[in-house]
Amino acid sequence: WTIMAGFRLYLACLRLCCACRFDLAGLDRLRGAGPLIVAANHPSLLDVVLIASRLPDAVCVIKAALFDRLLFGAAARLAGYIRNDAPLEMVLQARAELRDGAQLVIFPEGSRTAVFPVDAFAPGAALIAWRAAMPVQTVLIDYSSPYLGKAWPLFRRPALPLTCHVRLGRRFPPPADYAVFSSELEAYFRAELGQNTPSTATIGS
């Protein structure tokens, strides 16, 4: 709850000071839904904050490098987040968290999107779903700008207001074959996001 409250406060500051608009109501439908895997696309640095701000039982799988950052790393360890650099340990920790009732948030691309709509998926999300026998709830994140994406210069301001819409997609049952499911999951995201990707033309404007 402490992490969720902190993320909500941060988003409130972005709304107030930076004219950002976030439509996150769809995520509220997952509260109380019990343990499951939340698989989302990853266009921006804000994605973890957006999802975890609405889900009190969220445990996120994040890049190992983030644990080395002073403030975020401390918060990640406090929240019990999982590093993605040791596949076997990641799967075992994720399965244990799910069995304890957590909602596991994972970005199957493994890092922020470089080539929209999504980069190739790593097998981690599918492998966890298979080993833990858990359903996978897809979450689709759309921004009005590629701000804080991989291609966006860190100190370049976006056009305001920045808007973000987070919607629930299909919920997949526990997979019988993780390799087949990983391909199916990637194809689903490509189909759903293909017409709703932020234009990189705004980067040079």
Feature map (PLM): residue ranges:
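Short glycine-rich anion-binding loops that position phosphate/pyrophosphate groups of nucleotides
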Residues: 42-44, 109-113
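Short acidic active-site motifs
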Residues: 90-94, 177
